[in-house]
Amino acid sequence: MDYFTLFGLPASYHIDTQALSLRFQDLQRQYHPDKFANGTQAQHLAAVQQSATINQAWQTLRHPLTRAEYLLSLHGFDLASEQHTVRDTAFLMEQLTLREELDDIEQTKDDARLESFIKRVQKMFDTRLQQMVTQLDNAAWGEAADTVRKLRFLDKLRSSADQLEEKLLDF
């Protein structure tokens, strides 16, 4: 059973996150291992496994990027285990330049420049995310997979910038 079916949702990028949360809570209560503590070892083990599946499905579907990756996996694009990389050299060069800029910001400890950098990277991420949503809506699975690969780069860059911001604020 796929994660969307588990939560009673359509296999789509656009999901009702409130319904997802409510269904998660219901499933948690229904399959919590403690409810099977007095049952057989097999029942307890089955509850533990089901609970783990529910938690994994919840974590996957609640985050936009992992939800997109999972949806793509249902259409034959298993991005989680693939070794395929981004082949767009212009994008890769841009990422290299951005990484160098972030390193320079770290060396100079320039808060204002970091704030501007974070906003710029967030805008780039949001633009790509909207592009991916359009591609998913149009069932352009291959194009969406390429965009997700690029979003991963931007997400890691965004995370690195946020970590640097925390580091600079600690001073």
Curated annotation (Swiss-Prot):
Keywords: Chaperone. GO terms for molecular function: ATPase activator activity; protein-folding chaperone binding. Residues 2-74 form the J domain. The keyword Chaperone applies. GO terms for cellular component: iron-sulfur cluster transfer complex. It holds the Pfam family HSCB_C. It comes from the Bacteria. Belongs to the HscB family. Interacts with HscA and stimulates its ATPase activity. Interacts with IscU. This is Co-chaperone protein HscB. The lineage of its organism: Bacteria, Pseudomonadati, Pseudomonadota, Gammaproteobacteria, Enterobacterales.
